Amino acid sequence: MNLNEYQLDNDGNFDSGFIDNSMHSSNGINVYFRDLEKHLIGHINNADLVIGAVAWLTSDAILDALACVKNVQIVVQKEDFLRPDVYSRTNWKSKLRSKYDALKCDLTRYEFGNILSSASVASDPTIDAVRCVGNHNRDKVPAFPRMHNKFLIFANVQEIQNSFGHTHYKVTPYGVWTGSFNLTKNASMSLENALYITEPDIVDAYFKEYGQIAAMSEKLDWTTDWAAPQWRIGT
């Protein structure tokens, strides 16, 4: 059952029913309650760069849209099924990894303009399109620290060439998507909400927070249950 399509029984005496209360305001905030996946994909399609932190990323439709974006960098919660060396009796894990492998990030950490630019500056500057962070809940403890964010940031990327002929890129974030909506296969059938925010100070705050989460992230083939960042601040 899709809860977004549910209606109460009506005895016919009142001409009313459940409606979509989504709205667009003039102060840089849009509110969505229905068709969230469709709205999110629309924002993804317009971006040069999509970055963010989401607990889980398993929606085929969203992953297919992200595969068409020039640059993507998303941090997810550390889970056992993310590791390529973990055997799965079903093919969903290998399919998910192939979806992740289709995403690309040609930008270096130094071009993001947040704390990522200061992370292990003497090491390989590349960054994977999908990384993980947090603690692996091996014992399935209910109250366990997780990276439970659900936000994506949309940015323009400008190519700049200096007087020496060297090219670098300037990242300019312009919008944030956040709310209860998980980027998973079944979330579109649940009652969820999302905000799309373009107010510059709020966008910048999310951009800085993303940088901190990404700076403490690890590759998907993690080896330690507890958080084990690949980088440090400085060299």
PLM feature segments, named:
Residues M1-L49, W56-T235:
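PLD/PLD-like phosphodiesterase catalytic module centered on the HKD motif
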